[in-house]
Amino acid sequence: MSRPTLAQSSQPNNVYTTLADVRNALQIEDSLDDNDIQAAILAASRMIDEYCQRSFYQEGTLAAPVIKYYTPVSPWYLEIDDLIEPTEVRSRANQSGPFTQVWNLDTDIMYEPVNNPEIGMPVTRLLAIQTYVFPYFFPQTVKITGVWGFKAIPYEVELACKIQASRLFVRKQSPFGIAGSVELGTVRLNSRLDPDVEMLLKTYRRNFGLAY
């Protein structure tokens, strides 16, 4: 596999900061290290996903929604991935049957946290509120179609990604594990997330839903 070049890709997909922001943090004015900085941005973004057990980019659109399947562990509630815009919820009675049961918002199910959409946050849980219950005896019995992730990347995530990407880039140039810049200060580098990054991301951590 050939290494991506600037001509092929000036910015990786699904990342949480920009080349310009990291350049500025590192006080780099030329483009000689752009590919390495982009690799650091991509790695930092995926480290953030892993730490938070969620992704902050958007999957799908209303015109082309994404389908995910879930295995309920309770008849009354279902933990799901971050959902921005649900378009359809269906269930089936067993593992191999068709998804014939359609769930309607406010009559069959509620989305929680209920106030999240008003503040630009996704919903993460479904509640069964009427006669239907989630079929939890078999795996992958709930099918949800919609737009997933976050409408906009939270500011704390953007800042965390810039800090972590800067550290990853500087790390390869610092064999003794110590580096510094005017903006970052003197730092001891290691393979973990920066403590400030962890603090920024703390409120965004969650337990991951059972999607397949």
Model-assigned labels for residue ranges:
Residues 1-212:
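Divalent metal-cofactor coordination and adjacent catalytic microenvironments
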